[in-house]
Amino acid sequence: VITNWKKGTTEFECINPNGVSTILGTSAEGEEKIASPKAIMLGSLAVCSGLDVVAILKKMRVELDDFKINTTASLTDEHPRFYNEVTVEYHFFGQDLDKEKIEKAVDLSVTRYCGVMEMFRGFSKVKTEIKYN
């Protein structure tokens, strides 16, 4: 990943090996135009696990109307401030959801497949919850 500072700003452009660009940094006070590095970490955790869950459920032939993940975290009080507790809530929407298969898919992601989840466990207590809607 190549990261370039956008001169005169608090923004950086990150370009991944495929050439896809993402702007990260901090916005001017009162504006929330771009994602912070820590918010991107939480998003990466959710996407990593979400990709696993969707792929596993597809193989299990589980149909969903919708699926979302809410990720919240607490920061330490002292610098360097980092996430010391993270909660990942998996929200599943649909009729006659197969809870057993859904729970198995989430468990496989959390315990076996999601590398970002494993990285987070190195510095944070990670809790997961499953919600059915």
Regions found by a protein language model. Give the residues of each.
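Extended beta-strand/beta-hairpin segments
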Residues: 1-43, 54-133
